[in-house]
Amino acid sequence: MADPAAQSSAQPRLQQAQSSGPTGSNSNPGAGSSDPARPGLSQQQWSSQKKAQVRSFPRAKKLEKLGVFSSCKANDACKCNGWKNPNPPTAARMELQQQAASLTETCRSCGHSLAEHVSHLENVSEEEINRLLGMVVDVENLFMSVHKEEDTDTKQVYFYLFKLLRKCILQMGKPVVEGSLGSPPFEKPNIEQGVLNFVQYKFSHLAPKERQTMYELSKMFLLCLNYWKLETPSQFRQRAQKEDAAAYKVDYTRWLCYCHVPQSNDSLPRYETCQVFGRSLLKSIFTVTRRQLLEKFRVEKDKLPPEKRTLILTHFPKFLSMLEEEIYGENSPIWEADFTMPASEGTQLGHQTVLSPVSISGSPHSKGSSASALGVTGLDVASSEPTIGEKRKLPEALTLEDAKRIRVMGDIPMELVNEVMKTITDPAAMLGPETSLLSANAARDETARLEERRGIIEFHVIGNSLSQKSNKKILMWLVGLQNVFSHQLPRMPKEYITRLVFDPKHKTLALIKDGRVIGGICFRMFPTQGFTEIVFCAVTSNEQVKGYGTHLMNHLKEYHIKHGILYFLTYADEYAIGYFKKQGFSKDIKVPKSRYLGYIKDYEGATLMECELNPRIPYTELSHIIKRQKEIIKKLIERKQNQIRKVYPGLTCFKEGVRQIPVESIPGIRETGWKPSAKEKSKELKDPDLLYNMLKNLLAQIKTHPDAWPFMEPVKKSEAPDYYEVIRFPIDLKTMTERLKNRYYVTKKLFIADLQRVITNCREYNPPDSEYCKSANTLEKFFYFKLKEAGLIDK
């Protein structure tokens, strides 16, 4: 089937001739299938051209063609069901060049004349003759489809429709699909209404421009779904339960009869998939369709117009992820028949006609109506009139005291914040270099978040089941998780890992990249106790240092917030404590011991850590939110600076050789409201000689470590010519030794910063799987262990 998804997403204007009719279902969804005799023509285009040709035949030739499908009326005893030419064409597709048969020509089968087969058509209008000829072309089309089709279920449907149209030609009737399939629409609310409700539910609070972007994405998704080729029931059975497979087969048959086949066989009444099906079909097909759709866009990204590329590759994956939550969520309001959004929740979406009962009634589509039905002929959708609503009341859960507490003394007015936000989000108002690439100060999970939006990585909560038939893909992922955990946690017995990963009481949040597992977090939920135990957490070595671990944990936090569990407990070994601290874990355990004693597994030599979740924080977007907050504060500071008239002369002490001065000695610093941090001050060692000796001893231990050899001296240009072009701030252990002798390290922070830069530079220049990076990873663990041992950093 020719799938116009890519074209329609880039330019949401649908040309009906781009979609094909029934062909072999064993082809991949979205793969084009043209008529082999006419290269470059889709099945639908070929069908349209063929109908135009036969309708231009002379009357005699038309009767001959209809006679093939007309029973003999010479007498009641004749059982001939169609006139057969006594002089059949000798080569394929020669019928157009042959002369029309005479009405006196006898049938090769029964011996009666053509006139006795078409006597019922003598007084029939030309319009009706042309309608019947259209059905003849569709019958021939379906006949070829039946022979080419390899899937049994699809072949049966094609054969049924073939017989139905043949019967209609014989009886001069109109085709009506009968039986237990029912008639459209099959479910309410339908997919179109559900998706548009989703946009209204999730994005009505956004600014008009952003809200319009989300609306465009919803139209794009609906348009793709209307022309997307569904997987066959036999393919669906391989990944689903028996009961689900039976329901899907019914929906698939309905889709073939009412949506797919009529695209190229317009004798049958045609309906849009999104207007006659609802949540049940969407649940069955969404995960597979989403993956195939994103893959298709990724492969064909160079064909997309530049103005649509960012929309499709960056925003569309996130849009689909949010929609997925509402499709499979138990209590999503978007599927309620009486779904409404109060006026106070934000401006209503424009183009309200798509939500009206008329547009979802499931009426058959006339030619060329598919584009206008979804309102995709243009993107400039007019906003509806705002409704004047009553004054909003406080939510029931929010008391008056809570409301007062929200208004912080000295808080910045929202008008000012909105004004600053416009400056930050408007590219024309922002000066300076482009920020499209990741900055040096990008958050740890920024790369992972972008990859998820683009569909490069996926997150799935999976587990083994003893009560239901095992899904082959999930079992493969569980085996992959077992391998990752075994490889990354060598001190843990493999049998023990296998037992817990495949234990039905345990679940795992799996990180999938290119169809294979590259990491995961195995956990067990204790809902009655109010906490979850994290058992294993690992990312495969060649995919580390990309922020996957942080993003993985953030997804796990959001998953638990949805399920009402707000505490994590885990036993971390000495190498994992650092990771868990970065993710918000602490050694201070607030969960009462009576709640977890006897529930979680105790590991010798490991430290119990806890993480308390805040249900108001969107963890997967937290770093992005904090970054935006910093940008706002920076802009507010700039505004404040413009109001301060007092200007101090620049500092001259650095020209005289002074390397560092206390912050409080900067002229005017205290007038801005700055105060020194007593806590930070007390942390530094006051005796410089004591600090010097401690750092000297530590540096000596690092230099004698077996994995320190690549970092002993500066990198030579002869060995790496482009090194100093890539690395802006080179550092090595020899340079650090000289700095230590010159008393450069007046604080421990300067020393630790140089040590960390040694490792960072190595990772930036060398491939992750190189010997240098492996040495850097080992050395980093060693010196952080020594720093903790010496009390220079918190344990």
Swiss-Prot record:
Q: What is its main location?
A: nucleus
Task: Report disulfide bridges, numbered on this chain.
Answer: none
Q: Which UniProt keywords apply?
A: Acyltransferase, Bromodomain, Chromosome, Cytoplasm, Cytoskeleton, Nucleus, Transcription, Transcription regulation, Transferase
Report residues binding succinyl-CoA: 537-539, 544-550, 575
| GO cellular component, as recorded | ATAC complex; centrosome; cytoplasm; histone acetyltransferase complex; nucleus
Q: What is its EC number?
A: 2.3.1.48, 2.3.1.-
Q: What are its GO biological-process terms?
A: bone morphogenesis; chromatin remodeling; epigenetic regulation of gene expression; heart development; internal peptidyl-lysine acetylation; limb development; long-term memory; peptidyl-lysine glutarylation
The positions flagged as active site in the entry are: 533
Residues in domain N-acetyltransferase? 461-614
Please list the reactions this protein catalyses. L-lysyl-[histone] + acetyl-CoA = N(6)-acetyl-L-lysyl-[histone] + CoA + H(+); L-lysyl-[protein] + acetyl-CoA = N(6)-acetyl-L-lysyl-[protein] + CoA + H(+); succinyl-CoA + L-lysyl-[protein] = N(6)-succinyl-L-lysyl-[protein] + CoA + H(+); glutaryl-CoA + L-lysyl-[protein] = N(6)-glutaryl-L-lysyl-[protein] + CoA + H(+)
What residue spans carry the region label Disordered?
Answer: 1-55
Q: Name one GO molecular function term.
A: histone H3K9 acetyltransferase activity
- Pfam families listed in its UniProt record: Acetyltransf_1 (PF00583), Bromodomain (PF00439), PCAF_N (PF06466)
What does the UniProt entry say about where the protein is found? Answer: Nucleus; Chromosome; Cytoplasm, Cytoskeleton, Microtubule organizing center, Centrosome
Q: List compositional bias (Polar residues) regions by residue number.
A: 1-18
Provide the family line.
Answer: Belongs to the acetyltransferase family. GCN5 subfamily.
Could you give the domain comment from the record?
Answer: Loop3 is required for substrate specificity and adopts different structural conformations in succinyl-CoA-bound and acetyl-CoA-bound forms. Tyr-603 has an important role in the selective binding of succinyl-CoA over acetyl-CoA.
Instruction: Quote the protein name from its UniProt record.
Output: Histone acetyltransferase KAT2A
Its lineage opens with: Eukaryota, Metazoa, Chordata, Craniata, Vertebrata
